[in-house]
Amino acid sequence: MNRNDVTEKIITVKVSKGIQWADVAKKVGLSKEWTTAACLGQMTLDDKQAKVIGKIFGLTAEEQKWLQVVPYKGSLPTPVPTDPLIYRWYEVVSVYGTTIKELIHEEFGDGIMSAIDFSMDIQRQADPKGDRVNVVLSGKFLPYKTY
C-alpha cells in the first residue's frame, strides 16, 4: 500500500459514486482546488481532513494515514505530460513562460512566485462563442536576497 494506491481508490470511488470535487471540498471545508489536489496525492491532509475524506471515499484507517504523509509534489508520470489538458498548461509555460517571468520581474524585481503561499481559483466564464476557463493563480512574491 502506498499513496498512489489510495489516490487510485479515491478516483475509482469518485467515478463509481458520481462524486463531485466541489461537494468533497464543502465537506472538508476547503477550496475545491486544494481539496482536489490533496485527493490526487499532491497535498498533505491533517488527521481531521483525512477522516472526512476517508468517510466520503470509504478509506480504511491505514489509507487515511497515507493521506497525511508528505507527498512527492509535482510527480507526473512522464517528463512531458501526454494528457491533452495538462499538456496545454505545459504549452502555456513553453510559449509564455519567458513573458510571465519578464513581467513579474519588471513589476516585482528579482524573485519568484510562491507555489507554497499560493491559491488557485477555477471558474467557468460564459461566452457566446463558447464557454471559457478562467484560472486565477495567486502566489506570494518571494524576492531573492543578497548575502
From Swiss-Prot:
Annotated InterPro entries: Cyanase, Cyanate_lyase_C, Cyanate_lyase_C_sf, CYNS_N, Lambda_DNA-bd_dom_sf
Domain of life where this protein originates: Bacteria
GO annotation (BP), single: cyanate metabolic process
Entry annotation: catalytic residues: 88, 91, 114
EC code: 4.2.1.104
Gene Ontology terms for molecular function: cyanate hydratase activity; DNA binding
Catalytic activity annotation: cyanate + hydrogencarbonate + 3 H(+) = NH4(+) + 2 CO2
The keyword Zinc is annotated on this UniProt entry: no
Keyword annotations from UniProtKB, A to Z: Lyase
Coiled coil residues, start to end: none
Keyword Lyase on entry: yes
Cited SMART domains: Cyanate_lyase
A Pfam family reported for this protein in Swiss-Prot or TrEMBL: CYNS_N
Role, per record: Catalyzes the reaction of cyanate with bicarbonate to produce ammonia and carbon dioxide.
Family note: Belongs to the cyanase family.
Protein name: Cyanate hydratase
Native source species: Variovorax paradoxus (strain S110)
Gene behind this protein: cynS
